[in-house]
Amino acid sequence: MKQKLQIVTAIVAILIGLTACQKTTKDQLIGTWHYTATTTIDGGIINIEGTDTNKEDGTYSGVANAICTFYTEIDGVNVQIKMGISMKESGEWTVNDKEIVSSPTSSGVKVTYMRYYDPSDGSFLGELTGRELLEASDVFVQDLNLMEASTERILMLQENKYVTESIDDDGRKITATYTRVR
């Protein structure tokens, strides 16, 4: 009888130890993460690479660079436009079950370059510089709604990596892969 009691006590102690070691989803996401993702806006493809820092107090900050590629027609000529974008954002984040909800409190976007190419052979046609680039940047930023809350569903979560899924402006799924930096 005494031996059975010791075994039960040992099992209970192990179970208590295991549950004490389990981290919440939010605790696992605290830290700095490097990520890559591809999304679309108005038919253009955007490849994003950035770093987010999720803090224990529920705030976050992030920086990212993106390359947006889209096709249009200018004066009857088909062109491919490649645009470099630099972004900064900060705000609050929470975890609801298996979703990360980010609510920005500040954001900034700058178009760093805008180049035009011939889509048939990839040859360079021209680029915007100076005032033209600033004006194009302002128009692009107005089209974005970066102060809108976003939700990412967690598909996979490991100690040093996680994968999320969300829906972009064109209704397509965005899969982002995050790798722990620290």
Whereabouts are the PLM-identified features?
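Lipid interaction determinants
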Residues: 21-182
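Sec-dependent bacterial lipoprotein signal peptides
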Residues: 1-20
